[in-house]
């Protein structure tokens, strides 16, 4: 042994070994307790160490799953996996390599990410206090403490009671929704999370769901809770509405003597919601077949799945941040009255919860007002209509669910034919300006006398408040458009979401741009052309972003647009919101019976307008090719407009916005040319519009930027598609689809060799 080695051995023996502390809960993070990897070392042929007998992250280091086993012993409650590619165990991973190469580092990062998703997968009560990674769409966002499972333990005839359809009928619960139900009694500190489709009826005291307070009422509220979105948490409201304690129907239902129905308990009735949207489980939209779970629920109700204890699929709950609660509670103040019409504008970046808060704002305004107006400025993700449309909607009932679950007919709307105002900023502002003027002069003040409606929940009916949902484009041109919209709307309250902080590089040679500030020029009475700017006091609320979850990355905005488009064309809309929306997704669009409408001068549809880039290049003889299989907007004319008496003219601009009202969208499934006796075109239309609205349509507007998604063109039923084709036709006979591959260099299937770097090769 050399002298240097002897000195090292002596020093190692003399130095005391530090005691290994026992692993505690505080020392283990939720995302997984992994030791830091050792720095990379250069591998050489002679000095490479021997392969390690166990992995870098060995079993003596507690993992995230071991942490939860030590706290709540939830490993036995796990009944579902996040994906088929998830690992079966989180134990140590052995490797025959050195462990310091780039390949090993990538594998270890992959297992670390899987452990992070496992932490989101477990159905347990866990307070998440760690920050998300700065990479990806979640940059520097603090996760809120959330409870994934319900704080409710159902006990038969104590806080949970099954009610038959006959008992509901004898109690005069005749609202057109057949089927049995259950009555749940919630204490002050209890909550109930439910996935699926159900009807909610508050029976005693006010409850809270989706940041919305619901008081006892004879009305039943349809709730849509797919697992692709945050699940609603039902809990007693923090403040109870005076004079609305118990519903009279509760006295007509015979409940067991042991059932808890004291005055401090919150009682609610849950029934089946047979609307048809659960037909998505048949495979109409790929990736969304399992968002409604199974048909039979554990409570014996169809499509109702309470999240109590363990749950077979990964879910995450809907949470209300404190700043949201403060902003919503301010709506009950005395300034929201007849003297000050409420105009609220919600703005914020993408994925901040802007549309979710705006929907909660709308629902809470409906507690005081008979009707509330909604101005949609987001072309990409419309709340009550399909994309590429800006419009005004008038609502008298709350919307409890994601946007694709409550499509409604607009009061006034305009079709731009694109998902972004980048290509048409001028037309975008003109359409919104007209909608704001239409609201101020036609909808804001009603002719109804408020005394006629004071007996119905004491709601205000003399004027209609407005909620403006803006787009998430907050930089460059998007910021300029947002400022113009705010100046046109003149909101009384602005709800602004905090922008995500960006990492600014401050190295050598880089400087940060100073913030831009606007200053109003002083008023000079010497110049009569200059008018003083009258500024009203606008209350501004700063809101924190919605809590994020790793499960949100499963679906992109493009996926949600496809889901919204397919469900829109499978829906059946009604002129009034009192009749709920229904869906028929039992068969694909290619098998749906269409409307046959004639297109021509003096026919049902008289004119066609093409908008968007490249529309001016479509010749008149190519019009059938441009319309066949396209998504078009059906519009009505509200006044006379001097135009050429032809069906289509190349390069013709559409009528002014004040003369056109978009009724809805339609798909031209096919068309056929007329003959000499009956010239024109016969169109086969698929549209969710009712016949009364379809008969008002006079013109078609088509944009080349909006196309029908692929799931709307195929037969997605089991056995509907094979290698030869679908519907008994070969692929070469199927319109609008090209299944054959491209004959290009490198387009063939790649083959991988497995004998590279073998010995003797």
Curated annotation (Swiss-Prot):
Gene assigned in the entry? GRC3
Compartmental location: Nucleus, Nucleolus
Listed GO CC annotations? nucleolus; nucleus
Q: Is RNA-binding a UniProt keyword of this protein?
A: no
The EC number on file is 2.7.1.-
Q: Which GO terms describe its molecular function?
A: ATP binding; polynucleotide 5'-hydroxyl-kinase activity
To which species is this protein native?
Cryptococcus neoformans var. neoformans serotype D (strain JEC21 / ATCC MYA-565) (Filobasidiella neoformans)
Where is composition skewed (Basic residues) in this entry?
39-55
Q: Which UniProt keywords apply?
A: ATP-binding, Kinase, Nucleotide-binding, Nucleus, rRNA processing, Transferase
Protein name per its UniProtKB record: Polynucleotide 5'-hydroxyl-kinase GRC3
Bias (Low complexity): 1-14, 83-99
């Amino acid at each position: 042994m050399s002298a240097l080695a002897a000195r090292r051995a002596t020093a190692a023996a003399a130095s005391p070994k530090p005691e290994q502390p026992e692993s505690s809960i505080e020392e283990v993070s939720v995302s997984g307790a992994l030791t830091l990897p050792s720095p990379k070392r250069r591998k050489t042929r002679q000095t490479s160490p021997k392969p390690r007998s166990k992995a870098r992250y060995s079993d003596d280091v507690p993992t995230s799953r071991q942490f939860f086993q030590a706290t709540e012993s939830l490993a036995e409650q796990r009944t579902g996996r996040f994906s088929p590619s998830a690992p079966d165990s989180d134990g140590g991973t052995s490797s025959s390599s050195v462990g310091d190469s780039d390949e090993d580092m990538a594998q270890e990062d992959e297992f670390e990410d899987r452990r992070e998703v496992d932490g989101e997968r477990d159905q347990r009560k866990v307070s998440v206090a760690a920050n998300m990674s700065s990479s990806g769409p979640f940059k520097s966002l603090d996760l809120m403490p959330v409870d994934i499972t319900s704080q409710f333990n159902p006990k038969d005839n104590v806080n949970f009671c099954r009610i038959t359809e006959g008992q509901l009928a004898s109690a005069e619960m005749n609202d057109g929704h057949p089927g049995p139900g259950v009555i749940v009694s919630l204490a002050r500190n209890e909550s109930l999370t439910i996935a699926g489709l159900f009807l909610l009826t508050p029976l005693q005291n006010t409850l809270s769901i989706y940041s919305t307070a619901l008081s006892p009422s004879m009305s039943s509220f349809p709730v849509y809770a797919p697992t692709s979105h945050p699940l609603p948490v039902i809990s007693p409201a923090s403040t109870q509405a005076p004079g609305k304690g118990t519903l009279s129907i509760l006295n007509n239902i015979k409940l067991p003597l042991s059932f808890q129905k004291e005055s401090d308990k919150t009682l609610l009735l849950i029934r089946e919601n047979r609307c048809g949207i659960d037909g998505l489980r048949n495979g109409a939209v790929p990736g969304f077949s399992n968002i409604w779970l199974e048909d039979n629920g554990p409570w014996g109700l169809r499509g109702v799945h309470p999240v109590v204890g363990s749950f077979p699929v990964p879910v995450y709950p809907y949470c209300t941040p404190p700043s949201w609660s403060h902003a919503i509670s301010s709506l009950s103040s005395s300034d929201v009255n007849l003297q000050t019409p409420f105009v609220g504008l919600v703005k914020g970046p993408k994925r901040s919860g802007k549309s979710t808060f705006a929907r909660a704002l709308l629902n809470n305004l409906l507690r005081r007002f008979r009707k509330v107006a909604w101005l949609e400025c987001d072309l990409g993700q419309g709340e009550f209509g399909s994309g590429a449309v800006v419009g005004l909607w008038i609502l008298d009932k709350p919307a409890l669910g994601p946007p694709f679950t409550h499509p409604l007919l607009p009061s006034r709307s305009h079709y731009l034919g694109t998902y972004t105002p980048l290509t048409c900023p001028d037309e975008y502002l003109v359409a919104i300006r007209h909608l704001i003027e239409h609201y101020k002069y036609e909808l804001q003040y009603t002719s109804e006398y408020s005394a006629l409606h004071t007996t119905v929940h004491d709601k205000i009916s003399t004027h209609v408040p407005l909620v403006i949902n803006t787009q998430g484009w907050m930089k460059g041109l998007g910021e300029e458009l947002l400022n113009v919209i705010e100046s046109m709307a003149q909101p009384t309250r602005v709800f602004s979401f905090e922008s995500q902080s960006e990492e600014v590089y401050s190295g050598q040679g880089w400087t940060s741009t100073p913030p831009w500030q606007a200053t109003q020029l002083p008023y000079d009475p010497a110049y009569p052309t200059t008018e003083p700017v009258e500024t009203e006091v606008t209350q501004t609320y700063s809101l924190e972003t919605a809590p994020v979850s790793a499960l949100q990355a499963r679906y992109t905005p493009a996926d949600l647009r496809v889901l919204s488009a397919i469900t829109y064309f499978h829906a059946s809309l009604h002129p009034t919101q009192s009749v709920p929306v229904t869906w028929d997704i039992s068969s694909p669009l290619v098998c749906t019976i269409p409307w046959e409408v004639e297109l021509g001068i003096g026919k049902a549809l008289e004119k066609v307008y093409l908008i968007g880039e490249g529309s001016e290049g479509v010749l008149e003889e190519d019009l059938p090719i441009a319309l066949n299989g396209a998504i078009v907007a059906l519009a009505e004319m509200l006044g006379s407009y001097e135009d050429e008496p032809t069906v289509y003219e190349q390069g013709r601009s559409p009528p002014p916005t004040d003369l056109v009202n978009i009724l809805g969208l339609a798909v031209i499934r096919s068309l056929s040319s007329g003959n000499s006796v009956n010239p024109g075109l016969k169109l086969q239309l698929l549209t969710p519009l009712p016949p009364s609205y379809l008969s008002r349509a006079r013109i078609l507007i088509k944009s080349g930027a909006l196309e029908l998604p692929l799931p709307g063109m195929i037969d997605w039923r089991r056995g509907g598609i094979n290698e030869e084709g679908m519907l008994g036709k070969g692929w070469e006979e199927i319109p609008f689809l090209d299944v054959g591959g491209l004959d290009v260099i490198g387009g063939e299937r790649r083959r991988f060799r497995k004998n590279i770097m073998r010995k003797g090769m």
